[in-house]
UniProtKB/Swiss-Prot annotation:
Annotated family: Belongs to the anthranilate synthase component I family.
UniProt organism field: Mycobacterium leprae (strain TN)
Protein name: Anthranilate synthase component 1
Regulation (activators, inhibitors): Feedback inhibited by tryptophan.
Pathway: Amino-acid biosynthesis; L-tryptophan biosynthesis; L-tryptophan from chorismate: step 1/5
This protein's record includes keyword Transmembrane helix: no
Cofactor: Mg(2+)
UniProt: Mg(2+) binding residues: 348, 485
Single Gene Ontology MF annotation: anthranilate synthase activity
Length: 529
């Protein structure tokens, strides 16, 4: 079946690459201009554990060129009892046990492979998340908040089989990565044949029809349980304002968690987020447990990167200052002017830009850190933000993982100064943050990285969706306002969950030939919901 389909990577090319590449991609490009990223995900990944879908909508409007589907991941690196542990097949020669960040860096070095021209931006790598509480491995913090969800502080999939959807071309590049553990000719040929077999399986899956996913939906007000009442959250804000007045911090970013009982499929929440809240970082990730089943799912629509590393260039985009979008272009322009003229918002933004410069200064070559495009407004689907860009060149001997940990966690989710703000957060929040305020993204084997801050994100496990949101508290903050602001930020995901629960498939009961329309009454259950 399909064995006659040529791979872009020939056996001879593969043999040559295997001489000095530990990870060798074998690719096949197919025309798939009738597929959407979601239909391709359903066909290729089928909602299985250890699969993912990563997309991007620039400024909440036009979709970016690429969507990435994680089809297969034989291994995942996570943490158990404070030690690094591999789930699934342990990669040959990969370290295990000990400090998880050291094991991750050693794995990236073990699999380090120079970028190859012509490949999509993500072709293999470690894809997953760092929870906010990973910071406890970087800084000494008190342990006061209840660790009720018991989430791992880190889990990264070793993504070997990836599909890259090119929206500009209407093509999908299927990628089966062969990990070259043993450079003998026999082993290299075996690795190539195995990669071709996986490409054939992916190609066949893409060619299969799917049941219709056409559905109606509505947008009801979301249900939720809040951790705090408006009075309780107001008391937290008042306490932090007092701490700021006493000189303990300039800004602190408290939050609270919201919960919803739901049995809705995470992919349907993702579908609704694509409709209602498209953002620069969209992600669906089914996180495996030790048995190989899905332990929990992550669904998110984040507007904000923590850090990106591309060809040695490190970039972070501090975001601070928000206005809701207007109904018209004229309203948007007025709101932009108001935001840029707001002295309080500008002061907060400058503080976070300085924090970003300091973070990058820890890992970049001295003299290369620059602030570019300072304090401009970017519009998203529902809000507009004040944004700046801070860049630098990665220092000698520094890695993409160093850049991630230097910036972690985001100042926009902790405060300034960062460590003291996190200590104050630990004193006032009821439960550990878990995923909220951490990051979702990837480190590839060519030394690049791209991580989004885990906000506007749901963690779905055992019939409950957890959504967390907060906001920056400064000297003149108001408790009731901050409560409403945090609730509004959570609504984007809570609304998507509520809408997903109303999805009703339209089952017409008759398979129609392409281009043929059913006659009146031909389908016995036409229109039945």
């Amino acid at each position: 079946m399909h064995a006659h389909l040529a791979a872009t990577t020939s056996r001879e090319d593969f043999r040559q690459l295997a001489v000095d590449h530990r990870v060798v991609p074998v690719t096949r490009k197919v025309l798939a201009d009738s597929e959407t990223p979601l239909s391709a995900y359903r066909k290729l990944a089928a909602n299985r554990p250890s699969t993912f879908l990563l997309e991007s909508a620039e400024n909440g409007r036009s979709w970016s060129q690429w969507s990435f589907i994680g089809v297969g991941a034989p291994s995942a690196l996570t943490i158990r009892d404070g030690e690094a542990v591999w789930l699934g097949t342990v990669p040959q020669d990969a370290p295990t046990g000990g400090d998880p960040l050291h094991v991750l860096q050693a794995t990236l070095e073990l699999l380090a492979t120079a970028a190859m021209p012509g490949l999509p931006p993500l072709s293999s790598g470690m894809v997953g998340f760092f929870a906010y509480d990973m910071v406890r491995r970087l800084e000494r913090l008190p342990e006061l908040a209840l660790n009720d969800l018991q989430l791992p502080d880190m889990l990264l999939l070793l993504a070997t089989d990836v599909a890259a959807v090119d929206h500009h071309e209407g093509t999908i590049t299927l990628i089966a990565n062969a990990v070259n553990w043993n450079g003998t000719d026999e082993r290299v040929d075996q690795a190539y044949d195995d990669a071709i077999a996986r490409l054939d399986v992916m190609t066949a899956a893409l060619g299969q029809p799917l049941p219709s996913t056409i559905a109606t939906f509505s947008r009801p007000d979301p249900r939720r349980r809040a951790q705090c009442t408006i009075e309780e959250y107001g008391a937290i804000v008042d306490h932090l304002v007092d701490q700021i007045a006493a000189g303990e911090a300039f800004q602190v970013v408290p939050s609270q968690r919201f919960e919803v009982d739901t049995d809705v499929d995470p992919i349907d929440v993702y579908r609704m987020l694509r409709v209602t809240n498209p953002s620069p970082y969209m992600y669906l990730l089914h996180v495996p447990n030790s048995d190989g089943a899905t332990g929990f799912s992550i669904v998110g629509s984040s507007p904000e990167a923590l850090v990106t590393v591309k060809d040695g260039r490190v970039t972070t985009h501090p975001i601070a200052g928000t206005r809701w979008r207007g109904q018209t272009e004229e309203e948007d322009q007025l709101l932009e002017k108001e935001l840029l003229a707001d002295e309080k918002e500008r002061a907060e933004h400058l503080m976070l830009v300085d924090l970003g410069r300091n973070d990058l200064g820890r890992v970049c070559t001295p003299g290369t850190v620059r602030v570019e495009d300072y304090s401009h407004v970017e519009r998203y689907s529902h809000v507009m933000h004040m944004v700046s860009t801070v860049t630098g060149l990665l220092g000698e001997g520094r890695t993409a993982l160093d850049a991630v940990t230097a910036c972690f966690p985001a100042g926009t989710l902790s405060g300034a100064p960062k460590v003291r703000s996190m200590e104050l957060i630990e004193e006032v929040e009821k439960t550990r943050r878990g995923l909220y305020g951490g990051v979702v993204g990837y480190l590839d084997f060519a030394g690049n990285a791209d991580f989004a801050i885990a906000i506007r994100t749901a963690l779905m496990r055992d019939g409950i969706a957890y959504v967390q949101a907060g906001g920056g508290v400064v000297a003149d903050s108001n408790g009731p306002y901050e409560y409403i602001e945090a609730s509004n930020k959570a609504r984007a995901v809570l609304n998507a969950i509520a809408a997903a629960e109303t999805l009703t498939s339209l089952d017409f009961g008759v398979a129609l030939a392409p281009g043929r329309v059913a006659a009146r009454g031909e389908a016995g259950n036409q229109g039945r919901l």
